[in-house]
Amino acid sequence: MAGEEERGDGDPVSVVTVRVQYLEDTDPFACANFPEPRRAPTCSLDGALPLSAQIPALHRLLGAPLKLEDCALQVSPSGYYLDPELSLEEQREMLEGFYEEISKGRKPTLILRTQLSVRVNAILEKLYGSSGPELRRSLFSLKQIFQEDKDLVPEFVHSEGLSCLIRVGAAADHNYQSYILRALGQLMLFVDGMLGVVAHSETVQWLYTLCASLSRLVVKTALKLLLVFVEYSENNAPLFIQAVNAVASATGTLPWANLVSILEEKNGADAELLVYTVTLINKTLAALPDQDSFYDVTDALEQQGMEALVQRFLGTAGTDVDLRTQLTLYESALRLEDGDMEEAAAAAAAGGRRERRKPSSEEGKRSRRSLEGGGCPVRAPEPGSTGSASPVGSTPSTGSAPPTNPAFSSTGPASGLLRTSVNLFPTISVGPSVDSSCERSVYKARFLENVAAAETEKQAALAQGRAETLAGATVDDTDGSSGTRELWDSPEPASAPRTPQSPVSRILLRTQRSLEPEPKKPVSPPSPKAEPIQEPPTCVPKLCIGDLDFSDLGEDEDQDTLNVESVEAGKASPFLSSLSPSLSGGPPPPPPPPPPITGSCPPPPPPPLPPPATGSCPPPPPPPPPPIIGSCPPPPPLAAPFTHSALDGPRHPTKRKTVKLFWRELKLTGGPGCSRSRFGPCPTLWASLEPVSVDTARLEHLFESRAKDVLPTKKAGEGRRTMTVVLDPKRSNAINIGLTTLPPVHVIKAALLNFDEFAVSKDGIEKLLTMMPTEEERQKIEEAQLANPDVPLGPAENFLMTLASIGGLAARLQLWAFKLDYESMEREIAEPLFDLKVGMEQLVHNATFRCILATLLAVGNFLNGSQSSGFELSYLEKVSEVKDTVRRQSLLYHLCSLVLQTRPDSSDLYSEIPALTRCAKVDFEQLTENLGQLECRSQAAEDSLRSLAKHELSPALRARLTHFLAQCTRRVAMLRVVHRRVCNRFHAFLLYLGYTPQAARDVRIMQFCHTLREFALEYRTCRERVLQQQQKRATYRERNKTRGRMITETEKFSGVAGEAPNNLSVPVAVGSGPGQGDTDNHASMKSLLTSRPEDATHSRRSRGMVQSSSPVSHTAVGPSAASPEETAASGLPTDTSDEIMDLLVQSVTKSGPRALAARERKRSRGNRKSLRRTLKSGLGDDLVQALGLSKAPGLEV
C-alpha cells in the first residue's frame, strides 16, 4: 500500500509502495520472455531520493540476472522509462497515471529491465556481426521487436539504426532485403520512425535503388513504402526527388530511370507494380510547390519515352482500370499545367489538380515532350484558326476557370509590354507522337523564343527602371533626405553633376563621406633620438606589458582611495601627506590640508587619531544638514536612511517565523546627491539595482521556521546520525582531509566528466590521483550499501563511490594533469594583475550578477523582515547551506529558479567572469613579494654586468646585454606602477560594493575572488540542474505527442482509421502473444480488406478494392517455412501491421492527387510549358512580332 510517513514536524515524507518485477531482455531478439517473478514483491521507494541510489536495492531484492549499470526502471503498463538521475517527485508531472493509481489505493508495478540504449546497441552489434541463418533470424525478429516496445523505435532511429539496416541490406540478397523492408515498414508506421526516415535521406535513396531489383516482392514493398512516405507529408515529395537525383548522379543513370524501367516491363512487371509506379509519380508531382520542379520531373520522364508508354497502355484494351486512371491523371496534370483547359477541365475537377502561378514579366523554357515523339515545323497560327486553340489568357477569368496567367491584372508602366507577351503559344490537343526528323527546328524554336524573351525583358526593364527612378525620387523627398533635397532644390544644376541617382550609389556616397578624416588635435612628434641601450625617455610611457594593455590606469589612481577617505574623514595623520606616493615618476603629493578651524564638529566615535578639521560645519540643531565638501561627516542618525526603498516595495509583515539570513548589513550613508563612482553612475552598486518582486507567500511557505518542531524529533529519535563506514580510519581521515581543499563531490564529478579545467586545479588533480578507489574498496562499499540501503554512506565512502562511478577515472586524471601542466614564468606577475583589472570590469557590467544580488536581497529582506540596502558579498559563501523546510532544497536552487523566471536570458555567471575565477588561484601577497624579488634580481643583474664589463667582452655582446637589462629595468618599473594602480582600483571597487574603508582594508584579494568563484561555480552547477529538469519536462511533453503514435492517427491518414468498423481499433503496438481481442481485430481487418468499396461510403484515400497479393505472409514461427517469393502469393497477410500498411497503400493508390487547385505553384521563370506543348505548337503572333519576323508567303518560322 502506498503511504506517506509522518515526519516529526508534521509534513509527510513521500514514500511510495510499489510492486517490482524484472524482465530478462539482455538478448533483444529473445522475444518470448515475461516479467519475473509472477507474484511481484512489494517495495517502498523514497520519492525524494534519486532512483539511481535505489536501483541497487531493487536489483538485490529481485535477484535479477541483469548488469546493475545497465538497469532501468519502466512503469507498467504505460511503458514509460523513469529517469534514474531524478527522483519520483521530480518526475511527478510525467507520472500522472502512476500517482493516480496510488491515490486509488493501488500499488503500481515497476519493471527492472535493460536500458534502451544498451538494447539498441546489442541489436546493432548483432546485425553487424552475424551472417547466414543467424542474420536471417535476427532480421526476421526485428519487426516484432519494434512492435513490442514503442519506445525502442525513436532510440533505434537516433542510434543510426537506419544506416545499419541500409548497410546490411546493400550486401544481402533479396530475401534479407525483404525482411529489412518488413522491419522498415513497421518502423514507418510509427510517427517517430517516419520522422526518422524523413531526416535520413540515405533510406529514401536505398528504397528508390531497390525499385530496380530483380525481385518482384522487393520492388513492390519498396514502392509501397515510398508511396506512404510521399503521401505522409507534402514536404516529403521534394525529399524523394532529391533522393532520385542523388542516386542518378552516383550511378551515372538518368533520373527516374528505375521507375521508367518498371513501366517498360523489362522484368515482367504486373499491373500492380505499374499502378504503384504511376501513382508514386502522380503523388510526387501533386505535392511539388513550384512549376519548375514539376517540369523538371516531367521533362526527365519524357526524355525516356514516357509519352510513348502512356499511349501504349491507354491504347491497349486489356489495360487495368486503376492503371488507366492513374495514366489519365498524369496526362491531365501535364495538359492542365500547359494550359490546355478544354481537355483537362473534367479531370481537373475530379482529380483536384492545382493551378500553378505564371508570372507575367519573364519568358521561360518549355518542356521537351515531343523531342522523341516527332517535332512539327514551328509555324505562326492562322488568323482564322482560333477556336479551341485560342490563347488561354485571352478570355477573362470566370468562377469555374480561374485565369492561368495573372499578367492581365498587373499594373505598372510596363503592363502594356507585358500584356503583349503573355500567351506566345496556342493551346492544341495532344495526340499520338510521330518520329521526329527535324531536330534543327527544335533548337531553332528554342533560340527564337529566347531571343524574343530577351527583347521583351529588356523593354520591360527599361520601363520599370524609369518608374523606379521616379518612385525613388518621391520617396527620398518625402523622407526629407538632405542629399536628395539639395539635388532637387538646388538652383544650379551643375553644382552637383555627379550626385548618384540609384540607391547603391547613394549608399556608396554616404560611406565615402563617413570615411573622410575629421580634424584632430595635433599630436606631439616622437623624440628624434632613439637610444635603445640608454634609459627610457622622461615622458610617461604607455602602460603595456607584452600584449596586456594597462593604459586605462590613470595617474589619479596612484593614490589609494582608502587613504583619501581617511583624510576626508579626519582619520589620517598630518605627516602622511608628505610621503611620496609614487616610484619612478609618479604624480606629486597632494598639498597638506588647511589648519583646523575653530568650531568644527567632532568626528563620530571612536576616532583612532585626532581628526584635523578642514572646514566649518553648520550648527547641529536642525535634522541632518547637507554634507559640505571637505567637512567631517555627521554622526550616524538613529535610523539609517533607506536609500533603496524602491527595491523591495512595501514591507510585508510575515505571519509566520521564517528562516533568517545572518548577513552583515551595509550602512550606506550616501544620498542621492553623492558623486558618481568610477564604476558607474551611482555611488554604490546597491543604488543601481533594479527592484525585484518575489512571491512572498511561497517563500513564507518554503522557509517557515520549524526549529521548535524539529528539536523534539531529534531528542526522541536517534541522537546521532548513523552512516555506513567501511574504510579504515587512516584511509578515511586522509580522504576527509583532502576533501577540505577540493570542490564539492558533485562539482568534481561534473568537472571530471566535462574536463572543466576551471573547476579543479592541477594540485587538486594530483591529490585525486592519490585518492583513487581500489576495486576491493568498491566491492566492500557496494556490499555494505546493499546490506543497509537506507543508511547513507560516510563522506569518504560517498566520495570513493562517486569517483568509482566515473568511467576511466585514472585515464581522465592523467590526461587532465598533462593538459594543465603549463606555466608562463614571463607573465606570472602581469597576468594576475591584468585579470584583476578586467575581472572588476566584468563583474560591474554583468547583468546576471546584478539580478542575482537584487533577487537575493529581496528574498532576504522578506525572510528577515527588514529593509536592508545591501549585504556584504562574503555571505555568498553561505547561500548553498540554507535549505527550505519543505523539500530540503537549498536557497541557491530557489535563487536560480527565481533568476531564470525573472531573466530567462541570463547566463551562468561563471563563464562571464573568467578573469576573477583565475584571480582566485593567485596569492597576491606572494605576488607582491615576487615583484620585490624581481626588482632585486634586476639590480643584481646590472651589478653583474658592470663587473663583467671590466673583462674582455665583444662590443656586440655587451650592447645586447646592456639593451636587455635596460628593457628589464623599464619593464620592472612599469610593473611596479601597474601593481600599485591595480591595487588602488581594487580598494575603490570595494567601496563601490558598499564596504567601509576599514572593512575594505581587511579584504584580501584572493579571498574575495575565491568567494565569487565558488559561488559562481555552484550557481552554474545548480542552474544547469534547473535547466536540465526544465528541458526534461519539455522533452517529455514533446515526446508524448508522438510516443507510440502511428501514422494512421495523423490527419493525413485519418480517413484510413476512420473507415474501420467500430469494433476495430488500430493498434499502437502489437503484442507478442495473440489474444481474443487480436483475433477479432484480425478478422475485422480481413473483412474490411476483402469488401468492395461500393458497399459503403469511403474517403478518397481508401476507395477501391484490396489487391489479393501482399508483401509478405508468414504462417510459421521462423523464416524457413517459405521463401518471401512464395509467401507473396499465399493470400491475405497474417500480421496486423502488414494489413495496416496494405490499407494505407490502397488508400493512396485509389485516391486522386491532392485537392489543391486553389493554390498556385511558385516559379522563377514565366510561361514555361512542357516539351510536348513547346515543340508541337507554333509561334504566336506576339512572338513573331517581338522577333521582327514578317509573315511572307511561303515562309514558315
Curated annotation (Swiss-Prot):
Annotated ranges, domain FH2: 648-1045
SMART domains in the cross-refs: FH2
Domain DAD: 1085-1166
Biased composition (Basic and acidic residues): 358-371
One matching Pfam family: FH3_FHOD1-3
Composition skew (Pro residues), residue ranges: 522-539, 586-639
Localization of this protein: Cytoplasm; Cytoplasm, Cytosol; Cytoplasm, Cytoskeleton; Cell projection, Bleb
Any one GO molecular-function label of the UniProt entry: identical protein binding
Region span, Interaction with ROCK1: 644-839
Amino acid composition bias (Basic residues), ranges on this chain: 1160-1170
Domain FH1: residue ranges: 491-647
Protein name: FH1/FH2 domain-containing protein 1
The organism of origin for this protein: Mus musculus (Mouse)
